[in-house]
Amino acid sequence: LAFIALPGSAQQTVKEPSTEKSFPVTVTYTSGGTEYTMTVTGLTVRKKMFFKVYGIAHYQQDPVKGKLEDVIHAILTDGKAKQITMDFARDVDAEKIKGAYQDGFKENATAEEMKTLQPLVDQFTGYFTKEVKENQQFILRWLPGGVIVASVAGEEKPVITSPLFAKVLWSIWFGEKSIVDREELVEKLTN
């Protein structure tokens, strides 16, 4: 399972108001014998035109509060474990998901970076072979060292290790051309 309740405590949740999707306040993930505990930094919704596509929660290991620019910089810097959880509010076909990620990488990387990243982008978008159904989740984890672990509808995919890939992937939600309200994704760190 993607979420583990901490021993001896009831799992607290927070709700993204637009989609009414609930997310745990903390998540724990173990990789290579290291346990990472991450705290929610904010919630928002991904909309395409007028349609709600998914509720999204972002988590970070030992997040630091501060000004928006500093918080975003810390999130886009390798070193601490981070997680994005998307809980879908509607069905979306695989080709639309692949296209959205391909566009997201092109929007957030330079042409030179894309030359290096394209094989990894192809590998990543190859993970999306089936239509996503309402209430399914995509979980993306960025572990120290530029390690990306993707879980698509409960199935963990092969790891991609590239600090540049990780930064550009996270920039889809946290970069200057964010596809969501990135301030909402860090509101627990900037208030």
For each of these PLM feature ranges, what is it?
Residues 151-155:
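Short strand-turn-strand beta-turns centered on an Asx-Gly dipeptide
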Residues 63-143:
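Mid-length scaffold segments of soluble, non-membrane domains
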Residues 183-191:
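Cysteine/selenocysteine-centered motifs that mediate thiol-based redox chemistry or coordinate metal-sulfur cofactors
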Residues 1-5:
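Bacterial N-terminal signal peptides
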Residues 12-77:
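N-terminal structural module
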Residues 39, 57, 85-87, 149:
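Soluble periplasmic/extracytoplasmic beta-strand elements of cell-envelope proteins
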Residues 6-10:
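Sec/Tat signal peptide C-region and signal peptidase I cleavage site
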Residues 156-182:
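Flexible glycine-rich active-site/ligand-binding loops centered on an Asp-His dyad
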